[in-house]
Amino acid sequence: MEKHIWDEEQRHLTTVVEKLKGHIDVLQVFLKKQKGELIEERQSVSKEFSDLSDERGIDFATILPTLKEKELRYIHVNDVLSKLELLYKSAYFGRIDIEDEQLESLYIGLATFGEEDTGDIIIHDWRAPISSLFYENKLGEAFYQIPSEEIVPVQIQRRRQFKISYDNLLQIFDADIYIGDEVLQSLMTDTAKQKMKSIVTTIQSDQNAVIRSESHHNMMVLGPPGSGKTSVAMQRIAYLLYQYRRTLSAKNIMLISPSDLFNDYISNVLPELGEENVVHSTYYRLYKGMKRLPLVAETFYENVERLQKADLIHQESFYWKNSNAYAIHLVQSLQDLAMAGLPFYTLSIGKKVFISATELQELFYRKYTNLEIDFRLKKIRNHLMPRLREWKEQAILRRYEELRGVDQYIGDDEDLMRQSKKEIEKQYSPLHSAIEELGFVNIMKIYTGSIRSMDTSEAKKIYELTLRQIKSKQLFYEDLGPLMYIQAKIKGIDRNLDIKHIVIDEIQDYSFLQFKAIQQLFPKAHFTLLGDKNQIVNPTEKDQIPRELSDISIVELNKSYRSTHEITDFMSAVLKQDKVLSLGVRGRKPLVKRIDKEQRLTEIKAVVDSYYETNTSLVILCKDMASCRMLYEELKNIIPSIQLISQEQKVYMKGILIMPGYMAKGFEFTTVLIADADQSIYNGTNDKFLLYTMVSRATRNLIIFYHIELTEALKQIQKDLYLTETLK
């Protein structure tokens, strides 16, 4: 870059940073003073109105809104300060020169910053309509759309990018085509060093279209590993929060991901963009949050482990319960229950029948016959509550008379009545809960009945397996979707109307029924679905999911930015698919190496010593948790800093890690070492997809060890795509 251009940009940066510092100083002084005043006012109000009479209550009611207004103003100013402090660290990352009626230079950053007296904008928020021009892929004619939906044509004369630290200008790039390879790689340092970071400075044109898309309420984003699906989704969340800031907040958006560990891994992205983190969850946590489903269920990761070792009937059960055929059958079965066959429990208190299953059926099919199933059941609940109160009152009186006749109870009549009520309330509590929670409907019988009614030899075996699991009070993961859906349709659920948008990561691992259950839980939500059909951990039939969303756009990202060209080519060859277009750097080819078992620890230690440095990340992957634990026990004395990542892990850790391959999905590491790539271990139908996921975690270095015979999934890869070495 020519010196006079550099000097000019440095002067501009210095001026902007000085203005930012001035605003920050003013706000810090204001907030310090405001905080002190608020504390004093709260203490004064608390002291003065500690004893509220009617008259003083009126005074308190007039003071409270004023105090609340001051607190809201404090929160708002503090939010503005946080954004200015972000800008102070790196004021902007881009500049575009556009010609409308006149030539204008616009600087693009994480938030808007302007002159208060003139209203002139010094830094444009990257999410503003005009900032979309920065992410276009060419100079010349372009347009942007303003909120009134008016199209504004402009000429883009220059696109410039910066790397900035406080008031220091580190790098300048001029790009005719937005972020060419050289610029992209200068800006995209190895991100596998830490938690996921924002990609706002390196958003590509195809990614920008996804982030800003408003043509459909729902979107499915498909793409290979490293295409930025999750990163784009996080930027899309930030964009939606900006675009709809008057009606949408972080508490209205939910991200459903495979694990709490992954939620922690991405937890820095939105704060880096000046936004609060959204609501994070997992499918398993949604199940646990539902009332009236008391049985323990295995987690997603426990399910993966079980299926890796499962016999044929367990595998058939998983595929069958996740199939579209069963989903369609279950939906029809539930509709049929409106006419006949809904199973009820008889409710009793002690040995005395409170209401029989026969009477419940009479109420359901005769008295409330014209209503939806869940409304009928709520009518029955309302019908039973007066009877319950009457039974309790009679029981209390009987117990009171009993206590009066027993010498050991000493006390007056009030004491005896109080004791009677306490005992009866405790005795009737289970019955009260059963009525309140519609526990008189046999949900498990509905579920098992829907399986048995398929009337095939396969269904019969799966029915018997499911019965055994229910008796053991331990559900499989594949039971969660059907049971949550049945619960929602039959008993109804506490629907969350606050969530307006949901991002589901790894949608390829969700069944149709799981998705239907999520829709039931969050009826007001629109969806952004992220997936890659080749990264299947739990194979399900998922083609039906996008069909459930009437207004949906399906977008495919076909470029990978994560790994070197060599690793990306190797990854593509695992599944014998067309090469994924890699925009990564050039690097060393993957190493596929046979080692003797006796040398395994020495070889792994050598890899760690050669490839691991501070501010990089290295992971050792095995197929399952048992193998990881065994290897960890062998390595922990020779590599003291190694950390085993378990299924229960909730906090992402940096450094040298060891974890099962299925847990690595979504993460990226500078170096990946697959420690057990033998045919005897990876020989299942879906193991090639697991290996595809495992190799695609590496950004710079990929090493694969095997002991006897390399798995067929990797053996079929052409030899010029990797290096080999055999130890004698």
For the regions a language model picked out, list residue spans one by one.
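Well-ordered alpha-helical segments embedded in enzymatic catalytic cores
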Residues: T202-A209, R236, H329, Y485, ...
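Conserved phosphate/pyrophosphate-binding and hydrolysis machinery centered on Walker-type P-loop NTPases
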Residues: T189, K193, N370, D374-L377, ...
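Alpha-helical nucleic-acid-binding subdomain
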Residues: L241-I502, D509-A517, A525
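Extended, charged low-complexity regulatory segments
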Residues: M1-V200, Q204, N208-A209, T711-E712, ...
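P-loop NTPase Walker
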Residues: M1-L31, K35, I39, S46, ...
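Phosphate/oxyanion-binding active-site loops and adjacent basic polyanion-contact surfaces
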Residues: K195-I199, K229-A233, I380, L384, ...
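A structural signal for short, well-ordered beta-strand segments and their strand-loop junctions
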Residues: R95-D97, Q161, M220, V232, ...
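Conserved helicase motor core of SF1/SF2 NTP-dependent helicases
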Residues: N268, E272-E276, S281-R285, R292-F300, ...
